């Protein structure tokens, strides 16, 4: 809810698919109060991984022993496991956000 996707074709000038025609989508937010960007992003990643398993991969860690970039953004390694349902990841993220909101209350000045 709150977003419309339309097909998009482009040719990247850099990175893995530089110079190759690629298909994707343009996301247009129609209702900023209804769209949930984190949930949408994770659901899209899960769908892409499901539809194109041979082509889907996470960017590798920048340094050996480090976490992949997406895991760093997420704050944990849950999404690296292909069997981890998006709904479980989102529930975990909601619990962590609620815990953070409670902890930060002590630091509010007004």
Where are these regions (language model features)?
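Structural signal for terminal/edge beta-strands and the immediately following C-terminal loop/tail
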Residues: 97-110
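Conserved functional hotspot residues or short segments at active or partner-binding sites
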Residues: 1-92
């Amino acid at each position: 809810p709150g977003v419309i996707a339309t097909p998009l074709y482009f040719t990247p000038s850099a990175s893995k698919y530089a110079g190759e025609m690629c298909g994707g989508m343009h996301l247009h937010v129609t209702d900023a109060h209804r769209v949930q960007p984190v949930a949408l992003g994770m659901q899209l990643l899960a769908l892409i991984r499901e539809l194109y398993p041979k082509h889907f991969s996470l960017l590798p860690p920048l340094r050996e022993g480090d976490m992949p970039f997406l895991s760093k953004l997420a704050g944990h390694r849950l999404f690296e496991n292909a069997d981890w349902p998006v709904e479980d990841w989102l529930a975990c993220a909601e619990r962590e956000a609620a815990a953070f909101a409670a902890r930060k209350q002590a630091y509010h000045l007004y």
